[in-house]
Amino acid sequence: MAANPTVEHVHFPFDQQVTDPAEGPNVGFGDERSLLWKQQTYQNDINGLSMANCGVFLYDMDELDDGCAFEIGFLRAQNKPVIIVPFTNQPEKKPIMNLMLSEGATAFIKGDQELELLKTYDFNNCPCRPLTGYGTI
């Protein structure tokens, strides 16, 4: 994305990590989190999405992420373009995608084969690139 001349800024939620001093240093992924951490993390994500012109999602087909699906829906509800970059570590399996994502996104760039296209994709106009070769659920 940094090499793409049509990209001015990238918001990556993991660069906006929140810490709650009351939690201590050993909080791990999937552990119960404080209300402060949950509220601040959620609001930072919503703020980033609200200020974005479009969204690009690296979408792990092997371990689906409800948060990504929510964020994609949030952007589409605001009529903002969404580019999904699906990838898998199991290329031998027939890929399947949920209908609401496969028809809701503006463009698909297959992460396993087309990742280099992110360098030249026109994010100013976000041309449509329909998903092909996937089953639908």
Regions found by a protein language model. Name each.
Residues 1-137:
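Conserved catalytic or regulatory cores that recognize and/or transform ribose-phosphate-containing ligands
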